[in-house]
Amino acid sequence: MKSNSIITFVLLVCFSLTSVAQSTVDDPEIKKMLAEVKSENMEATVRKLVSFGTRHTLSDTKSNTRGIGAAQRWVKSEFDKYALASGGRLTSVIDYFTVKADGRRIATDSQLGNVMATLKGTDPTDDRVMVISGHLDSRASDVMDAKSDAPGANDDASGVACMMELARIMSQREFPFTLIFVAVVGEEQGLYGAKHLADKAKNEKWNLIAMFNNDMIGNSLSSGTMLRDNTRVRVFSEAIPFLETEAEAKVRKSINRDNDSPSRQLARYIKTVTNQYVDQLDIALVYRNDRFLRGGDHTPFSQNGFTAVRFCEMNENYDHQHQDVRKENNIQYGDLVEFMDFEYMKKVTLSNLASYSNLALSPKAPINVGIEVKDLTNFSTLVWTAPAGKPVYGYNILVRETSSQHWEKTIFVKGTKAEIPYSKDNFFFAVQAVDELGHSSLPVFPLPIR
């Protein structure tokens, strides 16, 4: 009887795999949103931000034509336009806060302000929150130079334009939980705007399930090596969580979970959704929190225990990054609009929109996800508890070999327990909840159950 049941289950698994492949269809509403992304809109946003001369965090706040203050007010005015089409659900604010002089990149006590739009969810019982950001500030060669031109077309008007395009499109629709779109400041001076928002989320106990940081997504040509790559974008994610208790570390080490942090699961999620919805763009999963010895606005969120990733172009051009605008030895330096690849930037924005909206429409993730370890067997039994809230149609069990970066197999099941013919010695697993339209939650890595 046991052998017959195993054979039957294997056949069911094979059938499930076939069924999933046949039934994976694009959500027409997400496809409609993607069709509304316009590279000319984002180019206009980038050019407008560049027109403010400099957006240095400590630059002029009074002028209406130059400096960070003018840029902040313009972004808010755009958010206010989007609000008109939102049925009153989108609201915007410049969230001012004070940063004390730090002896490094903040010379005197300064008032900074993140420009934030909040799209209120339609389900009052769903307390989830997501954040997407780009940083509004720019810099010249000298990080303390608040006077010289610092156009910041790519770093990071590109990320702000991406975020604003999502705000424009998504504010016309309804989503069950709250979505936040924010142009943070103080990035170049020490991630101050992101830290302020991350601390706010922690102190106010937000149920923040994901944070998308877009920083430099509009350049496709590297300096020096002269490599042009407009078909890949890097997504950075932390390996071992910044916040990890001694007990959690002990479990992680015992099951070799070093590459399965929640942030890394988000990165894989983005890759899966991008493969489904976006042509000619591959997500390059980079197994580090950020570039070598560098940081970004997702980092304060990770440090506060939130799931966060960074989108960044595949190859950076250091002639156009943190440079005074000048020409030397026939080389044009400076972060100018003329060096932008807006079609590449559009594809990265499509990836953001597909992933952000798919997750925004998803059911909550399964809870108490575990893998039974009471018996030695070449089968693996996973169990979990159904989440509260939005109805769940079923669950995806994700499977990959231990040496693989990305999930390789998807097994769809309807219950909350499944025995699958894959050894826990040779494979990693995760479970995600799925609704009837295929919107899936973030994957949850199982913990051992004895």
Which ranges hold each PLM region?
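Active-site-adjacent mobile loop/cap segments within catalytic or ligand-binding domains
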Residues: 50, 217-238, 285-363
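Beta-strand-rich modules
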Residues: 420-441
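Alpha-helical metal-binding/catalytic segments enriched in His/Glu/Asp
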Residues: 117, 132-133, 137-138, 142-191, ...
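Conserved aromatic anchor
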Residues: 378-391
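Metal-dependent peptidase/peptidase-like ectodomains
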Residues: 184-296
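A non-catalytic alpha/beta surface segment that caps or lines the substrate-entry region
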Residues: 44-120
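N-terminal capping segment at the start of a domain
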Residues: 23-67, 320-321, 325-332
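Short beta-strand segments within Ig-like beta-sandwich modules, predominantly Fibronectin type-III
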Residues: 408-415
